[in-house]
Amino acid sequence: MSTEDAALTGIAVTAELKKKCAFSSWYEAFKGHTPRAEVIRPLPEEFVSYVDQRGIRLAREEGSKYFYGQELEPTTDGEYSDWEGGDSASERSFVPLDPVADFPEVHARVKQAIARFGAVAPKLNRSAPKDAMWRLRNYSMKCNEANDVYLLLNGSSHVACDVSDTLLDWLASTEDEPVMELVLREWLDVNPALEFRVFVRGGEVLGACQRDLNYYDYLKPLEEKLRTAIEDFVHDVMLQRLPDDTFVADVYIPRPFTKVWLIDVNPFARETDPLLFSWNELCTLKPNAEGQPELRLVAENYIGRFAENNIGRFAAKEHSEHQVPLDVVEAGLNPQSMQKLVETWRDLLKIQEEE
């Protein structure tokens, strides 16, 4: 592919386009080409409020690994207090939503999906709570029980933005109420090096690139095989099933590279991360002499024109900016442990001040 200089190109993204990219819009058409999943929609208002509320009350059930003696709420100072410890009348009267009491049908379906698949990875509308993985002991999206799902969704800034965007789209529409959906995908232990983002415009593959921005020395020898697999999948499978011919797809190609899994479909718009490309570049790309799209891989000591728009994103674990020490995660599962951790910190600060 080649590019030419051009003014910054605008790309319109409509509520209708977002709907077409919703998981429930394409999942049935790609069964056998995407991991199994349970889609819960529409979601009751109580569930959406629960995900978006400040603080969380987990389901108290026998066998759960979470042992909350009382609910915890983050204060404005970033510390934690019990729900009844607020200073204002509104804080003292606030009662957190309870999964078992306030949305029992959704709670039951979450448990059923986990029982069916063994473990799940959650997603709300178009956002996966990857930025909240620090809340789970395994530091991943793998949810072994319903409370894992709730912790991820409630702690994710990505999900909070998704809720806000959905409400804004609804206000600008003629629909009676906003439609939210919870997707519980069967957990797959994927190799991040083999996940790729594919950019398709007008039925043509413009280019593809790694989703994980780290260097893997074994990818370069596989470049032609991976590119062929991506092109064949887009033309033979995706374009035959999707209503639009312009989109961004996330795919996974595990060894022996004979099967391509569709993970997600995103709008061809600036709100979708271009990763190793830039959006102005994608809007002006033209086929090269061979007519082959470029598969852009992270090179060793990656610098240059592909990296200039992504400085600071290489050689780093994805979402590492959201990580916290394991002690904090474990303390967050129990109020007594949290109190003990706070006391330990205070003792250390006191010793430091005395020195």
UniProtKB/Swiss-Prot annotation:
Subcellular location: Cytoplasm
Keywords carried by this UniProt record: Cell cycle, Cell division, Cytoplasm
Main location: cytoplasm
Gene Ontology, cellular component aspect: cytoplasm
Classification via Pfam families: D123
A biological process term (GO) from this entry: cell division
Family: Belongs to the CDC123 family.
Task performed by this protein: Regulates the cell cycle in a nutrient dependent manner.
Protein name: Cell division cycle protein 123
Organism for this UniProt entry: Eremothecium gossypii (strain ATCC 10895 / CBS 109.51 / FGSC 9923 / NRRL Y-1056)
Gene: CDC123
